[in-house]
A protein has these predicted regions:
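Basic, glycine/proline-rich low-complexity segments that contact nucleic acids
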Residues: 1-45, 66-176
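Structural recognition of beta-strand segments within beta-rich domains
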Residues: 44, 52-54
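Short acidic-glycine loop/turn motifs at beta-strand connectors
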Residues: 54-57, 138
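Beta-strand/loop nucleic-acid-binding surfaces
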Residues: 57-69
Length: 176
């Protein structure tokens, strides 16, 4: 890649197809219930995204978990059922559940487990009622406040890492 002076700044990178950025809702607090309209490819991330429309008719993009289908309902809030694609506070999620799009600070939006095929497992909830322990895909264990949100399920496109690019030109198209 080259900067405004024409000099190489990112070596061995360049070209690539033009991309339109899709604004993905990582907070999941702007709507309570929505219906999945479509599952779409996003050139800006490794996972697929789902286009959902809420009860007011406003469309949003969310990270698509594995097994989410067109027509499914997704909800967010403290009292929603444990179903794939639903976003809940960690205090409402049972121990042993696979979650993704995990917040680190309440209200900041999901920061962990957003890449294709990733998830964290809720290992335990602290007896003091303040923190939950989550094991990430890297086997790292993190303490996260119980009032942080997480989405049920595994992020879509788990085969992303096994895709064979097969030629230099395709790698260039993908800006890799």
């Amino acid at each position: 890649g080259r900067n405004h002076q024409g000099r190489l700044t990112a070596f061995r990178k360049g070209g690539g197809h033009k991309r339109r950025y899709r604004v993905v809702d990582f907070k999941r607090s702007s709507f309570a219930e929505a219906e999945v309209l479509s599952i779409e490819y996003d050139p800006n991330r490794s996972a697929f995204i789902a286009k959902v429309v809420d009860t007011q008719g406003i469309p949003h993009y969310i990270l698509a978990p594995v097994d989410l289908k067109v027509g499914d309902k997704v909800e967010s809030g403290p009292n929603v059922p444990i179903r794939i694609g639903n976003a809940l506070p960690l205090s409402s999620i049972p121990v042993g559940t696979a979650v993704h799009n995990i917040e680190l600070k309440p209200g900041y939006g999901g920061q962990y487990a957003r890449s294709a095929g990733t998830f964290g497992v809720l290992i335990q909830k602290a007896p003091d009622g303040k923190y939950a322990q989550i094991r990430l895909k890297s086997k790292e264990q993190r303490l996260v406040p119980l009032n942080c949100m997480a989405t049920i399920g595994v992020v879509s496109n788990p085969d992303h890492g096994s895709i064979v690019i097969s030629k230099a030109g395709r790698s260039r198209w993908l800006r890799k």
